[in-house]
Amino acid sequence: MSSTSLLDEFGTPVQRVERAIEALKNGLGVLLMDDEDRENEGDLIFSAQHLTEAQMALMIREGSGIVCLCLTEERANWLDLPPMVKDNCSKNQTAFTVSIEAKEGVTTGVSAKDRVTTVKTATYFDAQPEDLARPGHVFPLVAKTNGVLARRGHTEGTIDLMYLANLVPSGILCELTNPDGTMAKLPETIEFARRHGMPVLTIEDIVDYRTGIDLRNEYKSGLVREVSWS
């Protein structure tokens, strides 16, 4: 069965994006697949703005354990987060920065509660570089400007979805894994979505949805956005 057929139960490409946007607005999670000729993996995504300890615990329990905080380039620069390495030779050019931890309000930094505290600290509208310790247990990723139209990665897809949902442009992702430790492909991702009542969409869906929609100005103004935290 083709990936298109497997995704039919989640709607048309446009419906899949709009259902994901609605879920994120309501503080829920979504599952994002990248291209079949790329990683072909499902990532569990939540907004930083609405992130809860229960959601973080779900990511740690059901995912790879490497919880990443997706940021715009402007936000990463504002927080003084340099690249993890000078020469990024990873296959997909995944833009990790140095890892981070909140300086206040955490113990070891690895618990779900502590990681949520770190995420909230890094994404609060008046966050400063000195609010964060380096290294830590949260791994920031920097999205390319213009999102999936510049790079078809989960990082860019996450930030695009936050903009489309009119949320703070920061999101959390973690690769979904199977019980045996292997990576979840589309069939396993769909089964997880059914169990947890989550929408599923693809990077291709976001690319198609964004065609004709210009988010570049949103990216340029994404350095700071004041929000009411829930």
From Swiss-Prot:
GO terms for molecular function: 3,4-dihydroxy-2-butanone-4-phosphate synthase activity; magnesium ion binding; manganese ion binding. It is an enzyme of class 4 (lyase). D-ribulose 5-phosphate binds at R38, E39, D43, R151, R152, G153, H154, T155, E175. One of its GO terms (cellular component) is cytosol. Its EC number is 4.1.99.12. GO terms for biological process: riboflavin biosynthetic process. Mg(2+) 2 binds at E39, H154. Belongs to the DHBP synthase family. Catalyzes the conversion of D-ribulose 5-phosphate to formate and 3,4-dihydroxy-2-butanone 4-phosphate. Keywords: Lyase, Magnesium, Manganese, Metal-binding, Riboflavin biosynthesis. Its cofactor is Mg(2+); Mn(2+). Pathway: Cofactor biosynthesis; riboflavin biosynthesis; 2-hydroxy-3-oxobutyl phosphate from D-ribulose 5-phosphate: step 1/1. Mg(2+) 1 binds at E39. It comes from the Bacteria. The keyword Membrane does not apply. It catalyses: D-ribulose 5-phosphate = (2S)-2-hydroxy-3-oxobutyl phosphate + formate + H(+). Transmembrane segments: none annotated. This is 3,4-dihydroxy-2-butanone 4-phosphate synthase. The record marks H137, E175 as: Essential for catalytic activity.
